[in-house]
């Protein structure tokens, strides 16, 4: 990030999770929610520190439709969140990485749309 600030240009896409916005409700996996909430806070802090020329955002998918996610889940996949395909996740990351100058910074996105938290 310091080199991006020095050049007055850059893009950072943090991969977080919709679970990082919840204060409770993840019985059995609070450490996951806590680490994602910390990443969300870091996204906001870095965006403020970097200024308007370095865009720092986070994509926050819910469940991604992969075998690994469903086999390892300690709770019911989905949990009320819409599922996302791997392609939709990749499209969101590409969208954020290629935002035009003056685009959103310090935001959280799912399927190219900002999340209201």
PLM regions and their residue ranges:
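Glycine-rich, flexible loop/turn motifs
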Residues: 28, 64, 105
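Short beta-loop-alpha junction of Rossmann-like oxidoreductase domains
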Residues: 23-24, 60-73
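Catalytic loop of short-chain dehydrogenase/reductase
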Residues: 1, 5-52, 70
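C-terminal helical subdomain
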Residues: 51-54, 58-59, 74-117
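Short, flexible micro-motifs
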Residues: 11-13, 23, 65, 92, ...
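Residue-level detector of flexible, active-site-proximal loop/helix-junction positions
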Residues: 19, 63, 113-115
């Amino acid at each position: 990030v310091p080199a991006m600030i020095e050049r007055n240009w850059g893009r950072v896409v943090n991969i977080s999770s919709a679970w990082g916005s919840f204060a409770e409700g993840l019985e059995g996996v609070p450490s996951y929610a806590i680490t994602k909430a910390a990443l969300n806070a870091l996204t906001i802090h870095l965006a403020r520190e970097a200024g308007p020329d370095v865009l720092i955002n986070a994509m926050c998918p819910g469940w991604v439709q992969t075998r690994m996610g469903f086999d390892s889940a300690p709770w019911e996949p989905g949990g009320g969140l819409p599922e996302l395909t791997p392609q939709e996740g990749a499209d969101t990351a590409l969208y954020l990485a290629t935002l035009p100058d003056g685009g959103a910074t310090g935001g959280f996105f799912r399927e190219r749309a900002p999340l209201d938290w």
